[in-house]
């Protein structure tokens, strides 16, 4: 997934750069080839219901082989029992065997998309009005295409990095309950992805409503997604003889209590750095509230100001929300069972059981059980913020967008970093792609990303990986 933060009003518009690089300003640097790669990825359906990640991986592997990569350095992997959920491993060997590799990581699976709901065909890459439209254009086939394109460009140039540059394209990031490719690699192919650190999705650059750049974010920590099942069982009976002890009533009251509960504010290195940095950029009441919360997380007035912004609210705490309901077995019978799924995004380092225990207290009804139906991935371990990571990001960002600050961030959602960080591979969300305040339809209808953002992100990530590879 990608960050869905938004900005409710213009922020220091006069002081920040407007998107100015033209669509074709950087000349012919293989852009047509990159666009063909991007198009092929978007137009390869990789939804769980009808798609094929293995096919997408095979197509990207073919591009690398065509660029001259030997079979030993390009491999499509297919986990047993999951023929359409395969992925790609590739590498450009480095010159120093003592230097640990860097890993370019991307998932190629996408959220479901129904043609009848979309204005355009979701599985056709369409350029219109300065945007690329299509499922996965933003989340995250643009970056996946950049990673493949990077390896092609490096090979074409004869670039010999000090560190080995590895690529992993995976499936399953968007499909809860199915196989996760990054998690599978961490468990079954750990050596193949071993790296000093990895770069993947997570957060983008922020634009305000007028298209002014606000900041380039770097993901250093993220929450863990965990579902909890609220369930009530009851003997039921005939609907003509209602009783107060109704499974649906118990469940509705429980869900209502959850909806009104706020978990306490927490700060870690990532969101502390974010609010400290953004307080100077945002200014005004919001900026003052950010600074106040950093100084005192218990400042209720400051927290109330930040909570008006959905993204800031989510960055400050664990959040839980009802996502599905199911109850009853017949329209003329008292319900024998009622269930609700509560999806929680758990603040880094907080145990799952601690959240379950708190939900039990909030529900405060012995008739309602609170269970963990499935554990998907370990608890997030934040990647350390170091000069070796942030320095090159700042250098390249200032080359492309002078004056735009680089700000560490905590992602309210979750990415495949949740599998690599606990496996000992610090993983950072760095895209170099600036996105609109409304999120660009990620996971929703008519997903889009600015054409300019894709091409600028391509340039940014190309330069950044080169710097990292020669550290």
Give each language-model segment a name:
Residues 9-20:
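Bacterial N-terminal signal peptides
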Residues 35-46, 231-234, 371-378:
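Acidic/histidine-rich, surface-exposed loop or edge segments in extracytoplasmic proteins
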Residues 42-51, 132-137, 216, 237-242, ...:
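Second-shell loop/turn segments in exported
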Residues 91, 97-99, 111, 206-207, ...:
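An extended, acidic, His-containing surface patch that forms the Zn2+-binding/catalytic region
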Residues 131-132, 138-217:
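Acidic/histidine-rich catalytic neighborhood of metal-dependent amide-processing enzymes
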Residues 183-187, 240-264:
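A short core secondary-structure module
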């Amino acid at each position: 997934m990608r960050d869905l933060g938004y900005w409710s009003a213009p922020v220091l518009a006069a002081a920040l750069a407007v998107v100015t690089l033209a669509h074709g300003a950087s000349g012919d640097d293989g852009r047509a080839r990159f666009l063909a790669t991007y198009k092929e990825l978007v137009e390869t359906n990789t939804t769980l219901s009808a798609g094929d990640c293995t096919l997408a991986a095979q197509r990207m592997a073919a591009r690398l082989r065509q660029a001259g990569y030997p079979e030993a350095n390009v491999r499509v992997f297919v986990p047993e029992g999951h023929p359409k959920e395969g992925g790609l491993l590739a590498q450009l060997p480095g010159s120093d065997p003592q230097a640990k590799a860097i890993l370019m990581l991307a998932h190629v699976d996408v959220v479901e998309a129904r043609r009848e709901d979309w204005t355009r065909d979701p599985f056709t890459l369409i350029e219109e009005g300065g945007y690329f439209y299509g499922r996965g254009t933003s989340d995250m086939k643009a970056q996946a295409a950049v990673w493949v394109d990077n390896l092609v460009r490096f090979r074409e140039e004869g670039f010999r990095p000090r560190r080995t540059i590895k690529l992993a394209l995976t499936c399953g990031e968007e499909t809860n309950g199915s196989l996760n490719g990054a998690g599978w690699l961490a468990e079954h192919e750990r050596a193949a992805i071993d790296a000093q650190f990895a770069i993947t999705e997570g957060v983008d650059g922020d634009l305000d409503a007028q298209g002014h750049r606000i900041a380039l974010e770097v993901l250093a920590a993220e929450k863990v997604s965990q579902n909890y099942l609220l369930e009530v069982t009851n003997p039921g009976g005939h609907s003509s003889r209602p009783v107060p002890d109704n499974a649906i009533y118990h469940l509705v009251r429980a869900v209502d209590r959850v909806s009104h509960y706020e978990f306490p504010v927490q700060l870690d290195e990532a969101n502390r750095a974010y609010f400290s940095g953004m307080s100077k950029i945002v200014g005004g009441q919001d900026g003052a509230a950010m600074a106040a919360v950093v100084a005192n997380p218990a400042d209720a007035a400051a927290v109330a100001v930040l909570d008006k912004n959905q993204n800031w609210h989510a960055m400050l705490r664990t959040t839980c929300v009802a996502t599905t309901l199911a109850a009853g077995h017949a329209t003329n019978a008292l319900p024998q069972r009622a269930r609700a799924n509560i999806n929680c995004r758990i603040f880094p380092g907080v145990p799952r059981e601690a959240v379950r225990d708190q939900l039990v207290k909030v529900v405060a009804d012995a008739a309602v059980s609170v269970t963990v139906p499935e554990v998907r991935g370990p608890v997030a371990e934040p990647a350390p913020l170091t000069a070796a990571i942030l320095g090159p990001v700042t250098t390249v960002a200032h080359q492309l967008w002078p004056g735009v600050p680089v700000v560490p961030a905590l992602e309210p959602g979750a990415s495949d970093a949740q599998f690599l960080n606990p496996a000992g591979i610090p993983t950072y969300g760095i895209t170099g792609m600036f996105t609109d305040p409304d999120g660009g339809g990620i996971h929703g209808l008519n997903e889009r990303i600015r054409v300019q953002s894709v091409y600028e992100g391509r340039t940014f990530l190309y330069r950044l990986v080169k710097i990292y590879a020669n550290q």
